[in-house]
């Protein structure tokens, strides 16, 4: 047996899709029950493939319903499951209307707003008008939970509210940006782009990540690809900033212009690369490795040129990180 258990210290990404589904408790399990549950879910969630549409739920057994992730929740599967679990099975119109009136009063109360917003989101488009009342509240919690639910329902008016709250309330930032990233409306793109000019370093990088999740092929976030990492430059009028990712993706994101590497003395980038300031805006980058020819590159002090030079002599992500820490 050549298989051995192990732990990937830096984490990893599975190359195989995991099934997503609901298990019906054994005392309630039946073909009729699983069919009714999947029917109620599909009444709320439909997906479109080219010219056809289909539900997200499929009753596979008497006690198991398989789910596909709706596109609106591609960045937040846990919320998707929270919403799925709040769908009421076989609810008639009169009962739903009564429940919505009760949920509206709870939505406008900060202590119960989060749960009420999720339940209204589970109802779907019929609950939009009530959530729109929520974003008119003077309370930021009520505003946020209402806007978040509206965002996952694809309503454009959620975007300006989430943009403002991501900037002004740290506690809402991640959830607001994640909701914006899942929206297809241009107002969400405008909001994310606006947040990339924020004075907050966390907000700026969070907005960059949201834009990448929304559209990795966008010219704003596509970057320059080197072996093992990606370098991004974001034109920004805010203060210059460099972000070196320590998780998920090997990437360097530079906000602003004019960032230079000007070491006062010789610095090391890893164990084999030396960077020397030659003066007059020039750097000499040298790589010495046993058993290999010495490699050299001359660059300007502009950060982008330095990154390119380190890559040219054989350096990678860790060497560039060392350079930035030492410079």
Where do the protein language model's features map onto the residues?
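Long, low-hydrophobicity ectodomains and other hydrophilic envelope-associated domains
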Residues: 219-316, 323-324
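Structural detector for internal amphipathic alpha-helices that build alpha-solenoid repeat scaffolds
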Residues: 113-123, 133-134, 143-155, 164, ...
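Amphipathic alpha-helical scaffolding segments comprising HEAT/armadillo-like alpha-solenoid repeats
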Residues: 93-105, 125-136, 155-167, 185-197, ...
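Short inter-helical turns and helix N-cap capping residues of alpha-solenoid HEAT/ARM repeat scaffolds
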Residues: 109, 138-139, 168-171, 199-200
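Sec-exported extracytoplasmic/periplasmic mature domains
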Residues: 42, 46, 85, 89, ...
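Extracytoplasmic/secreted envelope proteins and their assembly/folding machinery
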Residues: 34-38, 42, 62, 77-85, ...
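Amphipathic alpha-helical polymerization modules
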Residues: 53-56, 315-318, 325
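Extracytoplasmic/periplasmic terminal helices and flexible tails
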Residues: 1-106, 111, 115, 144, ...
